[in-house]
Regions:
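Short beta-strand and strand-turn-strand segments in soluble, beta-rich domains
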Residues: 95-112
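Short glycine/proline/serine/threonine-rich loop/turn segments at secondary-structure transition edges
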Residues: 130-142
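Ligand-binding face of N-terminal immunoglobulin V-set domains in extracellular IgSF glycoproteins
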Residues: 123
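Short proline/glycine- and polar residue-rich coil/turn motifs
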Residues: 111-120
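Acidic/polar, low-complexity intrinsically disordered N-terminal segments immediately downstream
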Residues: 22-99, 174-176
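Bacterial N-terminal signal peptides that target proteins for export
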Residues: 1-10
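Beta-sandwich strand segments
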Residues: 29, 150-164
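C-terminal motif of bacterial Sec signal peptides marking the signal peptidase cleavage site
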Residues: 17-20
Length: 176
């Protein structure tokens, strides 16, 4: 009798569970596509580590290298597109110590997000000549960037709208 009742409850639970399942799990995104800087990294354990800054150091690069290109991943949230779209990057002047033409080369504030891509890259050429080479008295140069909304993109998550880039010419302590 007890076993019969237990079987009945088990069967009833299974029916309720199957009844509640919905096979339509595709929830099409309805809003405007959003753009953001990739603001996390995934460690070897699969955990996401969130950060609002990127360290770029010439410390281990041979001294003959006078400039290098920083590659910032940019990602968007939303539906894919089969056409190129534009996004806007501006410099946050009150948080920036870097000088255009001295610490980095000028870049276009309007950038192209390539068609059929989920992530793209913002390229910034960093110049080595004016960077401090002394760790003890070394200065970290800051360049703070901010994404702005365009006709093609709204802004993404708060943590990915602004990105602080710190660059120097000495062996810096790792951020991990």
């Amino acid at each position: 009798m007890k076993m019969n009742r237990l079987s009945y409850y088990f069967l009833l639970s299974c029916v309720a569970l199957l009844w509640s399942c919905d096979q339509d799990i595709d929830y099409p995104y309805q809003g405007k596509d959003r753009i953001q800087f990739q603001h996390y990294t995934v460690d070897w354990n699969g955990n996401r580590n969130y950060s609002d800054s990127t360290l770029f150091s010439f410390g281990l690069i041979p001294s003959e290298v006078r400039e290098d290109t920083l590659k910032l991943p940019v990602e968007y949230l939303g539906n894919g597109s089969d056409r190129d779209r534009t996004y806007k990057v501006s410099i946050v002047a009150d948080s920036t110590t870097a000088v255009e033409g001295v610490h980095y080369l000028a870049f276009n504030s309007l950038q192209t997000f390539r068609a059929n891509e989920l992530t793209d890259t913002l390229y910034i050429v960093v110049l080595r000549e004016a960077l401090s080479k002394d760790y003890a008295e070394g200065e970290n140069i800051r360049l703070e960037l901010k994404l702005e909304a365009t006709d093609d993109f709204a802004l993404g998550l708060d943590g990915g709208i602004q990105r602080k880039i710190v660059f120097n010419d000495f062996m810096a302590e790792p951020t991990w």
